UniProtKB/Swiss-Prot annotation:
Keyword field contains rRNA-binding: yes
Organism encoding this protein: Nitratidesulfovibrio vulgaris (strain ATCC 29579 / DSM 644 / CCUG 34227 / NCIMB 8303 / VKM B-1760 / Hildenborough) (Desulfovibrio vulgaris)
Protein name: Large ribosomal subunit protein uL4
NCBIfam families, A to Z: rplD_bact (TIGR03953)
UniProt keyword terms in alphabetical order: Ribonucleoprotein, Ribosomal protein, RNA-binding, rRNA-binding
Source taxon at top rank: Bacteria
Subunit structure: Part of the 50S ribosomal subunit.
Length: 206
């Protein structure tokens, strides 16, 4: 059972918190993480790419010159794939890249991602962020004090002041426990859990 120190926004110790081993101390299997990240990335794809086959390209219905007697190579259409401006054969067509991953596997992957951050000493628990106003400069100073570089911050609920203060800082992202994803955890080098969000994360994944 992992006992982790809790810090305030000035990097001063503010207590300790016990993290559930079934959520934060799971054996990491790269193939599971890879599968879930691939599924999440595939779901983001628009799949709107399209090329014109001979069925869709305009023109080319008339034979450009007679079959014999011209000395030129025979041709049946100006929209042959061999011609400039011609059709594309076996080119990409609109499609849906999404594929299903079982809910149990998705939850397991989230537990593994959280465990990897704890095992790599890249998990930080903070008491909270006290921001009197929307001020990027103010949060940038807090991030510098906490040593945050490329970090995902999990807040207990949506906080407009915090979100607006963070959005212009490269590499730092805010999310709630409901928005937690394997891709976002692995994409960011550090994971910052606001103390109030720990229980929600654990309840969701137990």
């Amino acid at each position: 059972m992992a006992v982790v120190k809790v810090y305030d926004q000035n990097k001063q110790e503010a207590g300790e918190i016990t993290l559930a081993p079934e959520v934060f101390e799971v054996e990491v299997r790269p193939e599971i993480l890879h599968l879930v990240v691939r599924a999440q990335r595939a779901a983001f794809r628009a799949g709107t790419h399209a090329t014109k086959t001979r069925a869709f390209v305009s023109g080319g219905g008339l034979k450009p010159w007679r079959q014999k007697g011209t000395g030129r190579a025979r041709a049946g259409s100006i929209r042959s794939p061999l011609w400039r401006g011609g059709a594309i054969i076996f080119g990409p067509q609109p499609r849906d890249y999404e594929f299903k991953v079982n809910k149990k596997v998705r939850k397991l992957a989230l537990r593994m991602a959280l465990s990897s951050r704890l095992a790599g000493s890249n998990l930080l628990v903070v008491k909270g962020f006290e921001l009197p106003e929307v001020k990027t400069k103010l949060f940038a100073k807090i991030a510098d004090t906490l040593g945050l570089d490329k970090a995902l911050i999990i807040a207990p609920e949506e906080n407009t002041t915090l979100a607006l203060s963070v959005r212009n800082i490269p590499g730092i992202t805010i999310a709630t426990p409901e928005q937690l994803s394997v891709y976002e955890i692995l994409k960011h080098k550090q994971l910052v859990l606001v103390e109030g969000a720990v229980a929600s994360v654990q309840d969701r994944l137990k």
